[in-house]
Swiss-Prot record:
Gene: murB
Upper taxonomic lineage: Bacteria, Pseudomonadati, Chlamydiota, Chlamydiia, Chlamydiales
Cellular compartments annotated: Cytoplasm
PANTHER family referenced in this protein's UniProt entry, alphabetically: UDP-N-ACETYLENOLPYRUVOYLGLUCOSAMINE REDUCTASE
Cofactor(s) needed by this chain: FAD
Protein name: UDP-N-acetylenolpyruvoylglucosamine reductase
Family note: Belongs to the MurB family.
Pfam families cross-referenced by the UniProt entry: FAD_binding_4 (PF01565), MurB_C (PF02873)
Keywords: Cell cycle, Cell division, Cell shape, Cell wall biogenesis/degradation, Cytoplasm, FAD, Flavoprotein, NADP, Oxidoreductase, Peptidoglycan synthesis
Keyword Flavoprotein included in the entry's annotation: yes
Amino acid sequence: MTDSFPFSVQESVPLSRFSTFRIGGPARYFKELTSLSEALTVFSYLHTHPLPYIIIGKGSNCLFDDQGFDGLVLYNNIQGQEFLSDTQIKVLSGSSFALLGKRLSSQGFSGLEFAVGIPGTVGGAVFMNAGTTLANTASSLINVEIIDHSGILLSIPREKLLFSYRTSPFQKKPAFIASATFQLTKDPQAAKRAKALIEERILKQPYEYPSAGCIFRNPEGLSAGALIDRAGLKGLKIGGGQISEKHGNFIINTGNACTADILELIEIIQKTLKKQGISLHKEVRIIPFRL
């Protein structure tokens, strides 16, 4: 079947290797993207040859099914960056967001310090409007390049894109995020702020276990982690999955968790908080075996 593609693909690639949860069965087809020209070829093909597909970066916000994915998984590894001016930088979407924040802050640039604690790609950060209490991705974003459903590269200025808390227009109107351009400022204190942020995260979050980061979005004016803690759910374990004792909004893989373990814990949290009149909405992407 792989011979029918006009580009190279792999079969039966374990998705657990591409998930920070370390959970997931095999992808029916798997394609690593390493250049924009390659991505244009792939999306032009998919426009005329319908096939279920998903796009992943570092898999830091995904929960794959134990059966895997019955379609094509596109792994975005398109990396690179260039300064367009003294304080504007264009970054390809497969680049590490955390490394970008660390590198820029160490060079005295402010605007992306918060990225040092976000373990995804630039494309994933734009898709989720990832952020912290300091800022979010949209705060310094000035332009996004996408490949649309027909395989055409488009450039969209920030003012034409509606972002909100952990939400971007790309969640409802799928497109391949090719690059993002950010506006920075020069600030010698940027590195100090970035260092303080990562130290705080290491102290408060369970980095020693595989996870997908925060499972739920914070309700307006509230902390999901604090709500889960007050509900007495921290430490609850099902199979190999556990609600972290360190941070209530993290579900961790203690070594042999399966998708069902994580989903059951998510359901318990939601039902428990619902009884208190609080609705928690998932931040993590649940990717089923079949779309």
